[in-house]
Every structure is written in structure tokens, then in C-alpha cells.
């Protein structure tokens, strides 16, 4: 596996691969990789001639009061995992290399205003900007994103269509710990009590998945799921919403495919989880 930090160097490698008609799979990450990332890499490895993993804690998707400086990092462990999974290239750009006094950003209306966008108003502008840059730099055939960040996945699919990127966006299932907690790099922030309390998210998800087919009104489904979170003393709700899978607008009736998504704080750590119900 090769590790590259310079944009010019990776663009030259991409040019060589493209000239040989090799397909490229891109797995964008912020590092501190876990088995959830591993599942994306494995799928990319199975479907492409070349696999690139980007490892970049993107400053433009963090607000001033968020955890940019404390976000967990372990490049050595990340390299070992990627090498073991057959990654061809890890791209590790610097903030200065990716953002040289930028005046241009990529934003998406409406979709970025809902759910996480309400409490993180500039987050998805940063996500869309860095993903656009990664697409332009690596020119992937396919790009792989996890369903845990469902709003991000929906936004990136829409952005890719709107900007006419000739890239297939692949969404991959949530990978969970043995006790159900969705794998996340931010789980490392949790102390033992918070870690135990955080399982209320997956318990709420499991309840929702089990009863949604009964045809309950969205309000009743939402209330029953919220109660599980609210009964946990260490949990502080940001949101729990049932929204249309395409527009991310709240729904009252479960007549179309929906995303059931939540964000909950445990101490200083904010975790998200979701499930999709398709009709």
C-alpha cells in the first residue's frame, strides 16, 4: 500500500490507472478506522481494480465549538488496517493542501437544513465541499459511504446527480457492536457509564423497526421510540425525527419510504443512529 499526501502525486497515479482503464473505488474517511470503515473497504475491494481510502479530518465540517482538535486520530493503526484489507493507496492530505485560502464552497439547499443541519448549520457545506474535492482529485468509479450517516449519504447522492459526476454512490449497512451500538469513531469519547447508556439508541431503533410495519401513525411511533431515550438519565436528545427518504421533510403518515433518524448527547459526545423503512 502506498501513502500519499500531495494532491499532484495522487492525481498522477490516478491518471496512470485511468489510462489503463482501471476502475477506482474511493472510501472517504476521517480516520480512526473501525470495523464499519472496514466493511466499506471490503466492498470497494470486491468491486474495483484500485481502492483509495482518504484519511482527512476535514476542518470545514466542524463548527467553532465542536471537536476538530480533539477528534481521535491514529494514522499508524489506520495504515495497518487498510494494508490488511488490500487498499492500494491511502490519501492523507493536509488542511493547507486541501484549503489554500478558499473562496469556493459547495452547498446544497433544503436537504442540509434538516435533522443534523439544524444544530450544525455549516456541517454539510463542509462535507459537500470536501467530497467534491476528493471526487475531482481521485476520479473514482464508485464511492462508498455508510448508512449510519444517512443524511450525509442522501445529500451526497443528490449532489452527485446535480453536479453530473459520473460516479456511482454506494451506501453500505450500519455495522454495530455486539450490544447494538452503531460503530463510530466518536464512541471512543464515552466513559464506561456513557458507553452503557448509549445502547438506548439501538434499543430505540430495534423497537421502531419491530413496530413500524403495524401501521402506527408517525407521531405514535416517534413517541414510543423517544421514551426509550428519555428514560435514560445520561441521554440528552438533540432530535428524533421520521422524515421522507427523499426530501427529509417530516411525515405524519407512513405511506412512503422514510428515514427514522436520531441524534443524542451523552456527556460531551453526540451520537447518531437511524433505520430506513422502504415501501
Language model: regions and residue ranges:
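Nucleotidyltransferase catalytic core that binds NTPs
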Residues: 2-234, 243, 247
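Phosphate/ribose-recognition catalytic cores of enzymes acting on nucleotide-derived substrates
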Residues: 219, 224-279
Amino acid at each position: 500500500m502506498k501513502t500519499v499526501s500531495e494532491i499532484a502525486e495522487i492525481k498522477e497515479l490516478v491518471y496512470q490507472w485511468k489510462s489503463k482503464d482501471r476502475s477506482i473505488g474511493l472510501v472517504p474517511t476521517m480516520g480512526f478506522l473501525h470495523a464499519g470503515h472496514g466493511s466499506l473497504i471490503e466492498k470497494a475491494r470486491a468491486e474495483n481494480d484500485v481502492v483509495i481510502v482518504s484519511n482527512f479530518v476535514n476542518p470545514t465540517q466542524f463548527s467553532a465549538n465542536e471537536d476538530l482538535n480533539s477528534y481521535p486520530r491514529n494514522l499508524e493503526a489506520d495504515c495497518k488496517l487498510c494494508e490488511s484489507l488490500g487498499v492500494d493507496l491511502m490519501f492523507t492530505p493536509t488542511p493547507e493542501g486541501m484549503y489554500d485560502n478558499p473562496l469556493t464552497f459547495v452547498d446544497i439547499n433544503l436537504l442540509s437544513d434538516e435533522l443534523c443541519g439544524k444544530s450544525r448549520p455549516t456541517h454539510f457545506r463542509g462535507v459537500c465541499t470536501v467530497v467534491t474535492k476528493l471526487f475531482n482529485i481521485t476520479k473514482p468509479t464508485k464511492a462508498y459511504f455508510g448508512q449510519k450517516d444517512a443524511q450525509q449519504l442522501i445529500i451526497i447522492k443528490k449532489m452527485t446527480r446535480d453536479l453530473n459526476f459520473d460516479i456511482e454512490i454506494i451506501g453500505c449497512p450500519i455495522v454495530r457492536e455486539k450490544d447494538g451500538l452503531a460503530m463510530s469513531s466518536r464512541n471512543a469519547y464515552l466513559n464506561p457509564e456513557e458507553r452503557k447508556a448509549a445502547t438506548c439508541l439501538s434499543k430505540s431503533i430495534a423497537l421502531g423497526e419491530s413496530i413500524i410495519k403495524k401501521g402506527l401513525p408517525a407521531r405514535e411511533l416517534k413517541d414510543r421510540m423517544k421514551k426509550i431515550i428519555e428514560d435514560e438519565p445520561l441521554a440528552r436528545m438533540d432530535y428524533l425525527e421520521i422524515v421522507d427518504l427523499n426530501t427529509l421533510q417530516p411525515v405524519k403518515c407512513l405511506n412512503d419510504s422514510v428515514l427514522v433518524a436520531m441524534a443524542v448527547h451523552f456527556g460531551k459526545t453526540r451520537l447518531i443512529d437511524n433505520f430506513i423503512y422502504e415501501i
